[in-house]
A protein has these predicted regions:
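Short, compact, well-ordered microdomains
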Residues: 67-120
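Acidic, aromatic-enriched beta-alpha/helix-loop junctions
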Residues: 34-82
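Short, cationic low-complexity segments
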Residues: 115-131
């Protein structure tokens, strides 16, 4: 099994080396993308790239971006060609969330095992899967 690619992430506190962790939210079966950073030699949760808004309308490859550090996260998505930022927004409470149409093939390159699990939760995508 080959090593997962590492992506650079720049934010207000500096630069981080990030791996992505792909999954599915339990409620609503939406696309989950977590960000892992190495701490003391161990890859652990750094932040969530996405947020679960199960009552907002979205396609299976779309997700809403967590509001904390969203400007930096949107730049990260663009820099690493993870997907396309959409004009629609999601809402929950007083927060507004950017919506992104993620490139599932690109996500397969970054976390093949996570995408296998994601495709198991979405059998309608199985013929598109290359992992």
């Amino acid at each position: 099994m080959k090593e997962q690619p590492i992506l650079g992430y720049d934010w207000e506190m500096g630069h981080e080396e990030i791996k992505l962790e792909i999954g599915t939210y339990y409620t609503g079966k939406g696309l989950y993308i977590g960000m892992l950073a190495k701490e003391d030699g161990v890859w652990e949760s750094f932040s969530d790239l996405t947020v679960n808004l199960p009552f907002e309308r979205s396609d299976v490859h779309e997700a809403f971006i967590q509001d904390f550090g969203s400007k930096e996260k949107l730049k990260f998505i663009q820099k690493h060609k993870l997907g396309k930022i959409l004009p629609e927004r999601g809402h929950s409470g007083f927060c507004t969330y950017a919506k992104v149409a993620f490139d599932l093939k690109r996500l397969e390159e970054l976390d093949p095992e996570g995408m296998k699990r994601f495709y198991k939760d979405h059998p309608e995508l199985e013929e598109q899967s290359q992992v």
